[in-house]
Each structure stands twice: as C-alpha cells, then as structure tokens.
C-alpha cells in the first residue's frame, strides 16, 4: 500500500481517544483529496491567472472540502452505519475508526455541514445549487429516508457527489458551469470509482443484509461495470479534449492489470487514493500550462 502525505498525519495528530484525534481520523485523511482535489481542478480550469487561482474564496473552498467537508460526509455515513460497520473489516483492522456514539461528535458533524452554507453568501447561483446538491447527496447517501447506499445503482449514481466540489470551485471563479461533457465524464468516473471501492465490502455488506451495486452484480460483473463506467467517462471526456479521454483510460487499464496479475482487491483498493491523486495532478498541471502558456 503506497504512503500518501496524509498517511503520516496519524503519527502527529492527537490520539484517537481525544475528540480532535477521533474527528480527524473519522474524516479519512487518506481520502481528503477526494473532495478537496476536485476543487483544485475546477478552480485551475476556471482561473485566468494566479490571482484567481489563489483567491480567498478558492482557498476557503479547498480548506473546507479537505477537512470539514469530509467530517460531514463520513460523519453522516458512520452515524447511520454504526450497526453495519460491526461487519466491516476496514473498521476491525484499524484503517478506519468506528462511530462511538458521542453526542459531541454528532453535533460537530452537523455543524460541519452547516458551515458549508456560509459559502451561499458569496457563490453565484449555480455554485449554490451545486453546493446544496452536494449537501443533499452527502446526507441521503447514508441517511433515511432515501439512503441511496442500500439501493443498487442509485448508490453508484449518487456518488457523483464527489465531483460537485469541482463544479462549485469552477463556478466560484468563472460564474458559470464547467463544460457539460466534463461534468458528465467526471460523474461517470465517480460512479466507477465508488463501485470499485465497494468490491472489498461485498461479503460484509451481504452479511449485514445491505444491497449495493456490487452485491447485486457480484465481484466479476462489478469489475465489468466499473470498466464500462470508466470507458464511458473517457469517451465523454474526449468531447472536452482528447487528452482527457486518453488520461481516463488508465482506469480500465488498471482493472485488466489487477485481474491479469491476480492482485488482491483488498490491497488494490488502498492504492487508488494515490492513483487518483496522480491523475488529478496531471489534470491540474494541464490547466496550469494552458493558463501560463496558452
């Protein structure tokens, strides 16, 4: 499992027994850039120069979606999955913390979500719509009455929430939506990424009586579903720029590599934050090159 800079935080942050240490671990440091990264990409493509790239609003959005946004997203998930997580090996092996039923934690999770509403004071209308959509999907993915995560295919579709911070970041700078092909392509990518990450949870979810896209399709067919999502994402991104379409082909290629070499999916899953960080960095570097050199 590759080490990310965020992985080193566990050695320096307060112990899990403290409230701050627990909250930081609940926010999944290894996955911080899953929300914060799209902000960087969105802002990079919207900005006309370094001034906009490092504007106070852009920085505030990145900081929010890196930590408080993750506390909100994963906090809601852990609160409503407390019983199910008893069967989750990710909790048993210490890679993720288990919800401890602390009222202070619940209050902070709610406050982390409410904090996002402050951006409504400065975002354009489209940015506000995207922000509200992100908040709604973050809650209803895990919480009743919709609880998308327990409905095959809706769990996958709803995980487009991960790309909405990028839409918000783009709208915050440009005032309009990013290209539709970029949004649809990124949404399809997120669908594949979410479902791929659910493969290690197939047996625990079945034991807990949870229906997901992965439990419904089974492991073999889930690989094909992910490949389909990523091939479609590459195809759609091609209409934004062919380079983006080519870049996205790394994902179906990795699936065939995993199957061909026989890599344990439980191990491969933990490589993807690093892979996604590298791909996101390439997207960002392309934007910066265009910004600086045309």
From Swiss-Prot:
Pathway: Carotenoid biosynthesis
UniProt keyword annotations, A-Z: Carotenoid biosynthesis, Cell membrane, Membrane, Transferase, Transmembrane, Transmembrane helix
UniProt catalytic activity: all-trans-lycopene + dimethylallyl diphosphate + H2O = dihydroisopentenyldehydrorhodopin + diphosphate; isopentenyldehydrorhodopin + dimethylallyl diphosphate + H2O = dihydrobisanhydrobacterioruberin + diphosphate
GO molecular function, one term: transferase activity, transferring alkyl or aryl (other than methyl) groups
Protein name: Lycopene elongase/hydratase
Pfam (any one): UbiA
Enzyme class: transferase
UniProt EC number: 2.5.1.150
InterPro entries, per database record: Prenyltransferase_related (IPR050475), UbiA_prenyltransferase (IPR000537), UbiA_sf (IPR044878)
Record's function text: Involved in the biosynthesis of the acyclic C50 carotenoid bacterioruberin (BR). The enzyme acts at both ends of the substrate, and catalyzes the conversion of lycopene to the C(45) intermediate dihydroisopentenyldehydrorhodopin (DH-IDR) and the conversion of isopentenyldehydrorhodopin (IDR) to the C(50) carotenoid dihydrobisanhydrobacterioruberin (DH-BABR).
